[in-house]
Regions:
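N-terminal interaction modules that seed assembly of large macromolecular complexes
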Residues: 2-59
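Residue-level signal for functionally critical sites in structured catalytic/ligand-binding pockets
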Residues: 33, 63-75, 105-109, 126-127, ...
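Ordered, amphipathic secondary-structure segments that act as subunit-interaction surfaces
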Residues: 37-97
Length: 138
């Protein structure tokens, strides 16, 4: 399982999402607010939960992209997740791509890969909270 998180500016979130999805068929791709995640390892840990939920039939939503957004927002309410973590046009945003394959960036993609480091206590708590969302639905 691999995940990448890119900080993007000066491009449309839907276009960035589409470009990464085309470059990585079968991957989960989602855009979120720029400040949502500052550590690529956090994005990978939460994305791993989404991929595992896909395999076990335990997604929080019908689409894995929405599951990832819900887990990052720490809620099971889609409207709340969009309000808390959803990307908006005209500003900086993150695009997260995750899958069970080597991930690639499309030609001309200008997103800057987030730094990757050990999880802080607050980031670890966020990963745990994301996992508990799935446990609450079981």
């Amino acid at each position: 399982m691999t995940a990448r998180a890119y900080l993007c500016e000066g491009m449309d979130p839907d276009e960035a999402k589409g470009a990464l999805a085309r470059a990585n068929p079968g991957a989960v791709v989602q855009t979120v607010k720029a400040g949502s995640v500052k550590n690529e390892f956090l994005a990978e840990m939460v994305a791993a939960q989404t991929l595992q939920a896909m395999e076990s039939g335990g997604l929080l939503a019908k689409k894995p992209e929405i599951d990832l957004l819900l887990r990052l927002a720490g809620t099971t309410q889609i409207s709340r997740a969009i309000r808390l973590e959803g990307s908006v046009n005209g500003g900086r945003f993150l695009v997260i791509v995750a899958g069970h394959m080597a991930l690639t960036s499309p030609p001309g993609f200008t997103g800057a890969q987030l730094p990757r480091r050990l999880l802080s206590r607050s980031e670890l708590a966020r990963v745990e909270g994301a996992a508990l969302l799935g446990a609450e639905r079981s």
